[in-house]
Amino acid sequence: MAAPIVDAEYLKEITKARRELRSLIANKNCAPIMLRLAWHDAGTYDAQSKTGGPNGSIRNEEEHTHGANSGLKIALDLCEGVKAKHPKITYADLYQLAGVVAVEVTGGPDIVFVPGRKDSNVCPKEGRLPDAKQGFQHLRDVFYRMGLSDKDIVALSGGHTLGRAHPERSGFDGPWTQEPLKFDNSYFVELLKGESEGLLKLPTDKTLLEDPEFRRLVELYAKDEDAFFRDYAESHKKLSELGFNPNSSAGKAVADSTILAQSAFGVAVAAAVVAFGYFYEIRKRMK
């Protein structure tokens, strides 16, 4: 499929879609599953073959029925409502925009979003996403395949500060933090505490303490939330652009024109979302 023409009209549609996603995510308390959708569409990238990645292919039944994507049909259906109002926006852009907004409205860092991804109907083979039962070498194999680094592995793992695992989807149950609708560094704080009643630690979480370089970053992020936010924003942007080469001048213009408005609105919405966080159990099926 052809890449979209990122002109003034397309950028206006992106702005409108961003606004609608903010409202949707705040009202439905669905930030965790929107972030998961963005990650899982992007996380299939293979740098060597240049296949997979954030191309919207996860919308196809062949891919969203992969075991690792269990439950993501909820997020796909929610995005369809936004797509119907803004048909010019590609699914690839929409899913990554949803992930950026999910972090933003729950109090996380601003992530620069550059549109222009093209859609694909070619689905990668199952098995490219991380297996939660594996150790640190598996994480390196998966992330290095995408062209990402150790810092990216640990920073992106911090995204588990949002949401919870569901046994019918992954075989695991429970949230990683006490406030699973708040994006902060508590994932790392809880990880260093060890086992805590009611909180989840996957094998892929625990293994971050077994490798010296991973542990160094865990300890840094646990004590310095600003460092975590800075590195997370950088790593999330890298993940969202795997295999995507935006025009540099257009990308800079988009970033410069949106980051200030994104920042100001995000603070207000984040406060509202966090305030309602205690009701997450009522709406947990929407995560």
Curated annotation (Swiss-Prot):
Keywords per UniProt: Acetylation, Calcium, Glyoxysome, Heme, Hydrogen peroxide, Iron, Membrane, Metal-binding, Oxidoreductase, Peroxidase, Peroxisome, Potassium, Transmembrane, Transmembrane helix
Predominant localisation class: membrane
GO biological process: cellular response to oxidative stress; hydrogen peroxide catabolic process; response to oxidative stress
One Gene Ontology molecular-function label: heme binding
Subcellular locations according to the entry: Peroxisome membrane; Glyoxysome membrane
Swiss-Prot/TrEMBL site (Transition state stabilizer) positions: 36
Residue numbers covered by motif AKR2A-binding sequence (ABS) required for peroxisome membrane targeting: 281-287
Catalytic activities: L-ascorbate + H2O2 = L-dehydroascorbate + 2 H2O
Highest taxon above the source species: Eukaryota
Sites bearing N-acetylalanine, chain numbering: 2
Transmembrane spans: 259-279
Free-text remark on how the cofactor is bound: Binds 1 heme b (iron(II)-protoporphyrin IX) group per subunit.
PROSITE patterns attached to this UniProt entry: PEROXIDASE_1 (PS00435), PEROXIDASE_2 (PS00436), PEROXIDASE_4 (PS50873)
Membrane topology according to the record: Single-pass membrane protein
Active site: 40 (proton acceptor)
Cofactor dependence: heme b
Keyword Magnesium: no
List of residues binding heme b: 160
The UniProt record lists the keyword Membrane: yes
EC numbers for this chain: 1.11.1.11
Cellular component per GO, a single term: chloroplast
Additional record remark: Binds one cation per subunit; probably K(+), but might also be Ca(2+).
Family: Belongs to the peroxidase family. Ascorbate peroxidase subfamily.
Free-text note regarding domains: The transmembrane plays critical roles in migration to the peroxisome and/or subsequent insertion into the membrane.
Function according to Swiss-Prot or TrEMBL: Plays a key role in hydrogen peroxide removal.
UniProt-recorded name of the protein: L-ascorbate peroxidase 3
Taxonomic placement: Eukaryota, Viridiplantae, Streptophyta, Embryophyta, Tracheophyta
Originating gene: APX3
